[in-house]
Amino acid sequence: MAQFMVTAAYTDSAFAGMANNPHNREEAIGKILSALNMNLESLHMTLGGKLFMVVSGSAEAAGSLRIVAGASGSVTDITVDEVFLAADQVDWMQSASAVMGAYKPANA
């Protein structure tokens, strides 16, 4: 399964809801992910009011997650980016090295 980094900023109304009804957001997020056949790898909050999580699943599910989160109205500035292990970069570098001479930049 692919992994995705999801970030978002809570709205003021979301903060009001959490202050008026303290609860574990991981449980609520887990329900959405389960419905999308995704897994929560890690969930973090920042002091600046941002949500940061790593999830695994399909690209289709990740796209759906973006729509569901946006439609909720409780978060803004949502990003969903596929992430890779740093070790994967070696393969990318080797592949790039093999084709560098074949590419002619537009400004050349």
What are these regions, as identified by a protein language model?
Residues M45-V55:
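Amphipathic, hydrophobic secondary-structure cores in small proteins
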Residues F4, L51-F52, T76-I78:
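Conserved beta-strand core positions
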Residues S58-A86:
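An amphipathic, aromatic/His-enriched active-site/gating alpha helix that lines ligand/cofactor pockets
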